[in-house]
Amino acid sequence: MSHYGRIKLLLEQHGLSPNKRFGQNFLVDPSVAPRIVALAGIKAGDRVLEIGPGVGSLTIPLLQKAGAVTAVEKDRKLLPLLRVEAAGVGALTLVEEDALLVDYTALAQQLGGPLKLAANLPYNISTPLMVHLLDHHAAFECMALMFQKEVAQRLAAEPGSKAYGALTVQCALWAEIRHGFDVPPAAFLPAPKVTSAVVHVQMMRQPRVAVEDERHFVRVVKAAFAQRRKTLRNTLKTICPDPNRWLEQAGIDGALRAEVLTLAQFAQLANTPMPTSAP
């Protein structure tokens, strides 16, 4: 029986089907999971985390390599299936929780140190989830993550490109990201309408540039990109009463758009005291 056929039969036996509300697209191509495991550099004894294990297509190869895996799964209907699949393979710890609400810093401390994360992320939450993971950057050593290709391209885009945005800048502060490989729609059940891509994310112990207040930095970046076609002096009006003076003090041309600013320039702006009154 093909791997695809086995997954379909497994779902039928447990009375399950992919849940659109949870953004479930189960991996049915057996060649993909080993490549994700390899990209993440998983080895025996690693502290491994998976988000959205689904029917275990990636979970089992992770268990075979590491011996133990902690997996965050929101859909409680999948938990019995996962326990059956993992029996005799390795030690699987299931955390029934919304991945967007997990305190990954606390989880890493509980497991003994930084984690290696491997995941076929639910597409409907992939962007906010990536931001949440970045908020807990110290909890991770590295990641191998599957996104829609369009989202994956945004993570490591260059200034001036169409894909460059707030998410790119946030990622650049704490991570080195490289493209791993593309995955066609036929690798999933159900098949999505778009191509997917797996990226490798290497977390850094120190930020790439000095940022005095990270929350303020993120607020500045989001405000700058909120209206992409507008200049900085216009987009930053939402958070600063005198953006022209602020930009001038930071040494940044207010006629520029956010999409051309580098990470260093965003840090420079965020680190420059903001005027508290209008001109």
From Swiss-Prot:
One of its GO terms (cellular component) is cytosol. S-adenosyl-L-methionine binds at residues 25, 27, 52, 73, 98, 120. InterPro entries: KsgA/Erm, rRNA_Ade_diMease-like_C, rRNA_Ade_Mease_Trfase_CS, rRNA_Ade_methylase_Trfase_N, rRNA_adenine_dimethylase, SAM-dependent_MTases_sf. One of its GO terms (molecular function) is 16S rRNA (adenine(1518)-N(6)/adenine(1519)-N(6))-dimethyltransferase activity. The keyword Methyltransferase applies. Keywords: Cytoplasm, Methyltransferase, RNA-binding, rRNA processing, S-adenosyl-L-methionine, Transferase. Its EC number is 2.1.1.182. The keyword NAD does not apply. It catalyses: adenosine(1518)/adenosine(1519) in 16S rRNA + 4 S-adenosyl-L-methionine = N(6)-dimethyladenosine(1518)/N(6)-dimethyladenosine(1519) in 16S rRNA + 4 S-adenosyl-L-homocysteine + 4 H(+). It is found in: Cytoplasm. It holds the Pfam family RrnaAD. Belongs to the class I-like SAM-binding methyltransferase superfamily. rRNA adenine N(6)-methyltransferase family. RsmA subfamily. PANTHER family: DIMETHYLADENOSINE TRANSFERASE, DIMETHYLADENOSINE TRANSFERASE-RELATED. NCBIfam families: ksgA. Specifically dimethylates two adjacent adenosines (A1518 and A1519) in the loop of a conserved hairpin near the 3'-end of 16S rRNA in the 30S particle. May play a critical role in biogenesis of 30S subunits. This is Ribosomal RNA small subunit methyltransferase A. It comes from Magnetococcus marinus (strain ATCC BAA-1437 / JCM 17883 / MC-1). The gene is rsmA.
